[in-house]
Amino acid sequence: MKGWGWLALLLGVLLGTAWARRSQDLHCGACRALVDELEWEIARVDPKKTIQMGSFRINPDGSQSVVEVPYARSEAHLTELLEEVCDRMKEYGEQIDPSTHRKNYVRVVSRNGESSELDLQGIRIDSDISGTLKFACESIVEEYEDELIEFFSREADNVKDKLCSKRTDLCDHALHRSHDEL
């Protein structure tokens, strides 16, 4: 009877470890996809487009303390993007990395809407995957909204690694793999 207890304990530990790995792969993949989508949307904005920021109160001398800032990285634009970005997770599929056996999430619909130019070999595409990825994305946006706005309000190199691995700990490994833009 003692042997069964140890077997049950071992099975519980193994299942818990597998679930934790799956959850971490999911949240890491959602973070990486979120960063890709935000970088894409920011790059699409005309760099000359600005927005007025500051106080709209009139000072005693009749002037206002208003500053023009680039719209692409403004808090207003980033907040707007964060409200919609997770809807794009339906454009991602799941792929198992053959060398690490970890799940990656890759775009399965190109940015121009055509899928004929994509290699979809070995990628699972279904509503369960996109649904769980969207939920993970929404959880990340809710929990790390301030960090996301802070990171994207200024240009930075290697945002995926800095945000997803170092700042939020959603990825347990540095993200040195390429993630081609479509």
Curated annotation (Swiss-Prot):
GO BP: negative regulation of gene expression; regulation of low-density lipoprotein particle clearance
Cysteine disulfide links: 28-171, 31-164, 86-137
Keyword Endoplasmic reticulum: yes
Pfam families in alphabetical order: DUF3456
UniProt-listed InterPro entries: CNPY, DUF3456, SaposinB_dom
Record-annotated Saposin B-type domain positions: 24-175
Cited PROSITE patterns: ER_TARGET, SAP_B
Claim: ATP-binding is one of the keywords in the record: no
Signal sequence interval, chain numbering: 1-20
Primary residence: endoplasmic reticulum
Residues carrying Phosphoserine: 115
Gene Ontology CC annotation, any one: endoplasmic reticulum
Transmembrane segments: none
Motif Prevents secretion from ER: where in chain: 179-182
Swiss-Prot/TrEMBL keywords: Disulfide bond, Endoplasmic reticulum, Phosphoprotein, Signal
Locations listed in the record: Endoplasmic reticulum
Family (UniProt): Belongs to the canopy family.
Quaternary structure (record): Interacts with MYLIP/MIR.
Annotated function: Positive regulator of neurite outgrowth by stabilizing myosin regulatory light chain (MRLC). It prevents MIR-mediated MRLC ubiquitination and its subsequent proteasomal degradation.
PANTHER family: MIR-INTERACTING SAPOSIN-LIKE PROTEIN, PROTEIN CANOPY HOMOLOG 2
Protein's recorded name: Protein canopy homolog 2
Native species: Mus musculus
